[in-house]
Amino acid sequence: MHNGFDALQLHANRLRGVTIPDLLAAELKRPEQYARQVGPLYFNFARQKYDCVALEALFALARNHNVTGAFQRMFCGEQVNVTEGRAVLHTALRGDLSGTSVAVAAYTAAAKVRERMYALIAGLDASEVTDIVSVGIGGSDLGPRLVVDALRPISQGRFRVHFVSNVDGAAMRRTLDMLDPSRTAGILISKTFGTQETLLNGRILYDWLGGSERLYAVSANPERAVHAFDIVPTQVLPIWDWVGGRYSLWSAVGFPIALAIGSQRFEELLAGAAEFDAYALRVPLEENVAVLHGLTAVWNRNFLGCATYAVMAYDQRLALLPAYLQQLVMESLGKRVKCDGTPVDRDTVPVWWGGVGTDVQHSFFQALHQGTNIVPADFIGTIRNDDLYTENHFALNANLLAQIEVLANGQLSDDPHRVYPGGNPSTLILLDALTPQALGGLIAMYEHSVYVQSVIWGINAFDQFGVELGKHLAVQLLPALKGESVEVVDPVTRAVLVRLRG
């Protein structure tokens, strides 16, 4: 059989007419047997549409693709980013698990940069600066933005951090209009310092601040940062080519995080991720949540034919998590060729999307409950929320449980307009509380789940060539928008340029 895929297709065929309530009735201990606890994180896969026999076939698929060996190669610093010839060592930013010289060197370098970062924070602490504007896009923005927003209520930092990513000048204007330049510092985050959005927004910020005295940078190309904005070299923090943007919040890209929540909280975030790293590397496949989550995604995509995947965050502080995961998953797994350059032989990443509960119940949940598509989902909530509004938290979690149940089980009615077909599989993830440790572990789990999926599909999760062509074309079209004579081949673009130029 084809590396276990054929056997799994037989199981999918066998389970086609089986409902999720049928599975719960057939396996009475399913709610406990399909649950895992990893530190402050609880996972329950009982409402996924597989049984124990199909699940064993999924684990066989993981063994056939040597997922365990793939984890070891990544943690040890082998060049698992084969298309760019690079190691992938974001795990070394938060811990040293493999003991190899490459990983140890990476961990040591990251620790030294954090010391420099904390020294810069101490300097800002002693100044009159109250606000920080962080300029970046993609991986240089989404991760820090998520963490700062999620952990703001328990922040130990004294700085208000404002994020600007879009090249649309309205975003920068809206931010700067509410700040005092004499009490503001800026951080420019760009791996290459060639990103159009960051350079343009950085120039606006430079001019608004009146120079580079309170301007900082994070880059794998520090010389370019110094040259482009005349930033003092000691105010530039390095990152490395073995850290991809969407995996970089653990590095100096997390500078805005540490400023916003405090150095101690940032270390707790790293520790939570490191704890999950140790778990992912050492726990056997059959008990490993990251492996099970990744295999479940493969099952829903390739064997149940689900083309989208939803993330529902039932905690307002995690409102940015769906957007963060959208980038992490779709930029990593949105590939059509394998590592060896041959076409993939099955579908890869579904479209990831989602929102925050209970708002989503009043927007797209109608389509989930009574539409024509089956949409698997992750529901993410918190057990304890130490705020003043406990009654609201009870109501929030009541809605969380109710929606999962109805989406899975459905409900019959004599009125066809009131039938809930059910059949939507979901995974429930609960954080004991939204702490830096728990958030770090949650993000690390998703990183490792993505890697599992990439190994099964034989694709490289760590490049993103698909984003390049559009950026290059935009640079070529920019002079045409300014009225310069530029050859434009595409007839529609040529016609629209006339309209845009007025």
Swiss-Prot record:
InterPro entries: G6P_Isomerase, G6P_Isomerase_C, Phosphoglucose_isomerase_CS, SIS_dom_sf, SIS_PGI_1, SIS_PGI_2. Gene3D superfamilies: 1.10.1390.10, Glucose-6-phosphate isomerase like protein, domain 1 (3.40.50.10490). Its EC number is 5.3.1.9. GO terms for cellular component: cytosol. Catalyzes the reversible isomerization of glucose-6-phosphate to fructose-6-phosphate. One of its GO terms (biological process) is glucose 6-phosphate metabolic process. This is Glucose-6-phosphate isomerase. It catalyses: alpha-D-glucose 6-phosphate = beta-D-fructose 6-phosphate. Pathway: Carbohydrate biosynthesis; gluconeogenesis; Carbohydrate degradation; glycolysis; D-glyceraldehyde 3-phosphate and glycerone phosphate from D-glucose: step 2/4. The gene is pgi. Keywords: Cytoplasm, Gluconeogenesis, Glycolysis, Isomerase. Its main location: cytoplasm.
